[in-house]
Structures are given as structure tokens and as C-alpha cells.
Amino acid sequence: MPKVDVYDIKGKKVSDVELAENIFGIEPNEAIVHSVLVNYLANQRQGTQSTKTRAEVRGGGRKPWRQKGTGRARQGSIRAPQWVKGGIALGPKPRSYKYTVNKKERRLAIKSLLSSKVIEKELTVVDKLELSEIKTKTMVKALADLKVEGKTLIVLADKNENVLMSSRNIEGVKTILLNNINVFDLLKYNNLVLPLETVKKIEEVYA
């Protein structure tokens, strides 16, 4: 069972905590992580691309020249695909790229990445992440005291306006709620900061 140190907001170690083996201590499954990531990115696509067919392009209703006797190839419209400014043959049309993956696969991908953070020593657990006011400077100092540098993802169990607003303008730092956790953010941000209550909630939800 993996064990990690627990720090207060000033970066002082206050205790340690044993993490659930089946969530934070599994062998990361890269294939599942890749599959779920591709699904996540596909679901983010707007799918609004569109081209006009020969029927939709303005003009081209008249036959450009007679069928026979000119020596040229027969043509029916100046908006056929082979013409400049003609319609597009088999071009993209608006469509949805959304598809679903198994709930089990999604959960396994999250657990794989959480375990990866433990293995790579990129997980920081704090006993409480609470600020008395909305102040970016206070949040910057807290992260510095915790020795968290670079891209950082903070996951909260419940909405905390002071933390959300104080971290919003810090470059390379993103704060989300646990119900919005996803593989993309876990891969994009090197460091993961979890308050103790978030750890407990994760162990309840993903048990």
C-alpha cells in the first residue's frame, strides 16, 4: 500500500497517509490511457467544418458550351468539381465526432494516471487547502512552500471559491473539481496537488 507525506499549506510535514492500493498503487495501463485520451479529444471537437457541393455553389446552371462539335471535352456546369470555383467532391460536412468508452475503461485510465503520479513522485497531498481571502499572491506562496513547480493540477472535492479564484491567474496552474477530473488534464499537468479530503473522496468514488 503506497504511503505519502501530508503537508500543511506552509509546506511543513504534518503526517503521512496510506493510499488505496487498487487506486494509487496499480500498474499503469498505457493502452487504456491512450484509448480514453483519444475519446476525450474526439469529444471536444466541434465538428462544424463544411464545404459546398456542386449543387450548393452559386451559379453554374447553364451548360458552358454545346455538347458536340467544339472539340473540347463535354461539360455540364462550370461548378463541377474539376472547375476552378467549382463545388467540392466528397468534402467534409458537419458531423459529430462523439463516441463513448466503457465506464470501467475511463475509471481504469484515471487510476492508472493517479498511480503514475505516485510512482513519479508528482503527487503532493495537503491536509487542508483553504484560503481566508481571494488573493493570487497567497496561492503562489502556498505552492512555493509546497515546493510545487511547473505545470500543476489542483483537484478539489468540493467547490472552494477562494482557492478557485486565487489560482485562476497563475500561469501553468489549473484548479478543477473532482467530478471534472479527466485523463487530458492528468497528462498535461506534471504535478498533482490533492487535499486530504479529495484523496478520501477519490477512494470512495473509485473503490
Question: What is each PLM-predicted segment?
Answer:
Residues 54-90:
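Glycine/serine-rich anion-binding loops at beta->alpha junctions
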Residues 1-46, 92-207:
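Extended polybasic, low-complexity segments that bind anionic RNA or targeting/receptor surfaces
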Residues 30-68:
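A short, flexible low-complexity segment enriched in Lys/Arg and Gly/Pro that occurs
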